[in-house]
């Protein structure tokens, strides 16, 4: 026997477009246990194991077959359809669908779908005594160590698992004074950023609990809270009630308690980029100082007006219509954030985010089909001149059938430069039924190079990623 590595190949079904799953493990021991991922359900899978020496030379190989069972879960989509695919133009990888199950209190069920619409990986927590009824409103993110991290909104924990679903860390956030909400990410130091509620925080009456208006930084190895940002000291907490007058009984409606509804946080250089469903997109520094805010100018108190960026037309000229600036009217070449999610920095310094279109122009008239649409938007921000210009969008042309009032997200795809636009609920699908979509768009041509329909399904986020972590 010699030291060496194992290369795994899970062969694709004949006639399929998804490439074989290939992965070389880093372990060089004489005895190795390897996780085999990417098996088709209800199929006699063909697997090849290649044994190499330390120089990468093949020493032997084995061909195996492994019969799998049918997936049985009421939480999976009624049907998965690939309605469009230009496989040579797509970003490589699987689509990680972060589904909450059948509702917010159900057991979440993340799964990966390949380019042919086949489920190739699933994390079935329903069979776990530890994680049954886990609520991954945050969705799984892949950490720098190759594991997954998520926030559990049902039990208010921060959970780290490996690719086989084994628990690595399970941090009780209630013990730390927080409940989980909607988004987590990892900074360049490896710390976790999370949008949370603080259990001891009250609104001005000293009675009602504030929700969804804190951001924390946590050491994922020690569970130590390293920093806390209170949005009340950063944004205008008196700016609420403009939209949801008829939804005051809804726990997710805008109110004195849920005035911000923060739902996205990422590191951006030495600063941070965040979204709040009801307040827009904002950039802040480590000390909690607001650098700027992208939001309709209506209803902000005077002391915040200097933080608001001024909108430009596509040609770079200022928008001067006071109704457009205030947000009570929309112009053809600029959209304010309405019910926004998941702002992410782009390599060119711009911002890509998901604009749900919820409460556009401060109205909640879902019968106004002309004004009901969802889109992914790219902004160019000029921090010197304090302006914001919309340079790209996709989704408005799809109309009301593409509208999703909540959840959802976007992703910049690094290899191709494509964008993943992900309306996670309430879409009218090609057969007339409701569900969710995953749309991959080439921003240079506006071509849809891939679109997936998930019938009778919802999700929080979708991410295109490799099945195995690339750095492990």
Can you name each region flagged by the protein language model?
Residues 18-29:
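Solvent-exposed serine/threonine-rich low-complexity stretches and specific carbohydrate-binding patches
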Residues 2-13, 29-33, 37, 41-472:
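Histidine-/acidic-rich catalytic cores in large beta-rich domains
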